[in-house]
Amino acid sequence: MFDIALRSGPARGGVSHRVRTCDTVDGGYQCFPRLSHRWGQYSPYFSLANTGLPSEVPEKCELTFVQVLSRHGARYPTASKSKKYKSLIQAIQANATAYNGQSVFLRAYNYTLGSEDLTSFGEHQMINSGIKFYQRYAALTRDHVPFIRSSDSSRVVASGQLFIQGYEQSKAQDCDADHSQDHAAINVLISEAPGANNTLNHNTCAAFEADKLGDQVSAKYTALIAPPMAQRLHHDLPGVTLTDDQVIYLMDMCAYDTVATTPGATSLSPFCALFTDTEWSQYNYLQSLGKYYGYGAGNPLGPTQGVGFINELIARMTHSPVHDHTTSNRTLDAPGADSFPTNRTLYADFTHDNGMIPIFFALGLYNGSDPLPHDRIVPATQADGYSAAWAVPFAARAYIEMMQCGRETEPLVRVLINDRVAPLKGCNVDQLGRCKRSDFVNALSFAQDGGDWAKCGVSSK
């Protein structure tokens, strides 16, 4: 069973409307969890607060700094994928001589999905994310305005703006907040143009961009799991012949159709019933493999794509200039530049899943796991908390906190990924997953040394 909440939707033309939604501020998306929490990076954000260490701020601790790193909200397929999905549906309808079992709906299904932009549900996700950030960190948000950056993709910028809408909505309702301050706004847009230095987006490491390891591993696993599914679908759809990739496209449609059909994603797409429970576990692992070997530790240059952001994070946490020769923009990050202050208490950055995965691995958050095997499922609970659905769902968010506790002489650092405390690696971690700031910074030597940027074949700008 699941609960469907009512909330105010984004104002359009000055009119706010009520929306039935499966997304809540605290819990994220909790409808159809046996399926929706296994859609890899296409899963809508769901809270992992109850999967590990306590996520509350410990007693006798006072927060002094928070950085949020967020993925955009749920979107329509990319333009290239949307074209493939539509062509597949048309081919099925042109060739099927019958529609048996769960495939009956395909006879009359009309593909109407857009491309690239946020869905209405994705918009609501980001408003909720802003509300949650304000409320979770009210001790700071009442009196401090976050410094906000966004990669300049339209859906990422829109996500940042909607986050701000939720944030300011909560602040306006908080009687204890300082209402004399300026409203939060996106302070810096960072170009995603090819070759532009951008710590929130990979595109400047030539050797990495040319690498196809993630695609190769995904293709190998797809060839393992898709044929039995295709055999069943061919029985249900006589006259139709599906490739392995097309089987996966039909699985993709389950998630995309669900987050697009209703504003609150309250209706499960009929595409979902085409596949079994076991097959959804396989699909989830397929997506995890793709991210791990495409952008994470499975790729020799994956974590290197995240070191620029880590070096910016160090600068923010230590109130010092950025020391980086990889993806940072030296003009934007110049010492004393208004575009990169290091004296703020709150920071927010908005990007894509493929921008976040390298950052998480550059932080070493999943270093407690062996490399993911290509031929069997290793769930997140056995992979140091890593899976695509647990790490980078739609509207994913990482919180990096500093807190002053009791008689400690320096602040402690803690990282939460979708509300799950990710115990830090490489430093003297305590029972709550935290390290002292100096120890945390020292543990980030991979980033401070530039990772393996020398293997990229380019020089930073």
UniProtKB/Swiss-Prot annotation:
Enzyme kind, highest EC tier: hydrolase
Post-translational modification: Glycosylated.
Keyword hit for Hydrolase: yes
Pfam families xrefs: His_Phos_2
Glycosylation site list: N95, N110, N197, N329, N343, N367
Gene3D superfamilies: Phosphoglycerate mutase-like (3.40.50.1240)
Keywords on record: Disulfide bond, Glycoprotein, Hydrolase, Secreted
Active site: H72
S-S pairs: C22-C31, C61-C405, C205-C456, C254-C272, C427-C435
Cellular component GO terms, alphabetical: extracellular region
Subcellular location: Secreted
Biotechnology annotation for this entry: Phytic acid is the major storage form of phosphorus in plant seeds and, thus, in seed-based animal feed. Phytases are therefore of considerable economic interest.
SUPFAM superfamilies linked: Phosphoglycerate mutase-like
Residue positions binding 1D-myo-inositol hexakisphosphate: Q41, Y42, R71, H72, R75, T78, R155, K291, H352, D353
Thermal properties of activity per the entry: Optimum temperature is 55 degrees Celsius.
GO molecular function: 3-phytase activity; acid phosphatase activity
Reactions catalysed: 1D-myo-inositol hexakisphosphate + H2O = 1D-myo-inositol 1,2,4,5,6-pentakisphosphate + phosphate; 1D-myo-inositol 1,2,4,5,6-pentakisphosphate + H2O = 1D-myo-inositol 1,2,5,6-tetrakisphosphate + phosphate; 1D-myo-inositol 1,2,5,6-tetrakisphosphate + H2O = 1D-myo-inositol 1,2,6-trisphosphate + phosphate; 1D-myo-inositol 1,2,6-trisphosphate + H2O = 1D-myo-inositol 1,2-bisphosphate + phosphate
The protein's Enzyme Commission number: 3.1.3.-, 3.1.3.8
Activity-pH dependence: Optimum pH is 4.5.
Stated role: Catalyzes the phosphate monoester hydrolysis of phytic acid (myo-inositol hexakisphosphate), which results in the stepwise formation of myo-inositol pentakis-, tetrakis-, tris-, bis-, and monophosphates, as well as the liberation of inorganic phosphate. Myo-inositol 2-monophosphate is the end product.
UniProt cross-references to PANTHER family, sorted A to Z: 3-PHYTASE B (PTHR20963:SF24), MULTIPLE INOSITOL POLYPHOSPHATE PHOSPHATASE-RELATED (PTHR20963)
The protein's assembly and partners: Monomer.
Family: Belongs to the histidine acid phosphatase family.
The protein's name in its UniProt record: Phytase A
